Amino acid sequence: MSVSAAVAAASTSRTLVLARHRSPPASRVAATSRGRPFSSGPHPLAVSPATRAPAMATDGAAAAAAAGSKKKKEVLIFDAEEDLAVSLAKYTAELSAKLAAERGAFTVVLSGGSLIKNIRKLAEPPYLDSVDWSKWHVFWVDERVVPKDHEDSNYKLALDGFLSKVPIPTGQVYAINDALSAEGAADDYETCLKQLVKNGVIAMSQSTGFPRFDVMLLGMGPDGHIASLFPGHPLVNENKKWVTYIKDSPKPPPERITFTFPVINSSAYVAMVVTGAGKAGAVQKALSDKQTSSDLLPVEMAVLQDGEFTWFTDKPAVSMLQNK
């Protein structure tokens, strides 16, 4: 899907499933994972009936663009971040089992920020022992061009909070070459991805011609940015490169590399993990029916061509939504 098509689809295709998650006891969480195959429908932890937000009407070219995004965006709302973390771990572990069995590899894309804290349950029982970590291949949706041991490094954040606690083979964790310039690091990372597509580690989307990662675990900034794709920045319109670079990030540090929207939108699964009242305004705009293509936030441009998009949120993050 081109970026322009993604913009049109984001502004016209607004069917959502809103599911409120009560705080289930640990015994119930464990029970939901037994005797139930992985489902691409509502997540097994949805313990109350889902409601549907009305979809906007579509017409003409906008409807044609939206046709590339027929999958609903499911919005899961948790009473507490702890319950969100439990459900996110289960979601990821089930995808790992399903897709590793199908493909022989499981490609996971991480973001920085609070996402690493949100996936902490994967490094605890039962997942620490039950997940086949040897099949995992880990990438970053964006990275700051700083040394790997720098406090701003997304690699360091993930290493300290997650990767050092699980037995993923070192050679299957793909950090950037921090000795290169931003442009050089972006080109080098894209070259790495193309080689992994050639080797069959990363799938290729037959519909878009871009790499198809198994799952992206993403966060969102208070301004609605995802990856290092910021509101109003020209990079949101990049539609040829897989990985590009930015030297004038509005959020420090200024030099970064980032996946482009065609890569993000070719994913098989995306979990958008957003917590806290500070992001409620962006969540409200992203999930509102009242949109125009001229004022989309980057998070609204994440429209999967042929995949499943799930929001993992807590009550403060959706506090400005009317139908929460």
Curated annotation (Swiss-Prot):
Main location: plastid
EC numbers on record: 3.1.1.31
GO cellular component: a single term: chloroplast
Class of the enzyme per the UniProt entry, highest EC level: hydrolase
GO terms of biological process kind: carbohydrate metabolic process; pentose-phosphate shunt, oxidative branch
Pathway linked to the protein: Carbohydrate degradation; pentose phosphate pathway; D-ribulose 5-phosphate from D-glucose 6-phosphate (oxidative stage): step 2/3
Database matches in Pfam families: Glucosamine_iso (PF01182)
Protein name in the entry: Probable 6-phosphogluconolactonase 4, chloroplastic
Organism name: Oryza sativa subsp. japonica
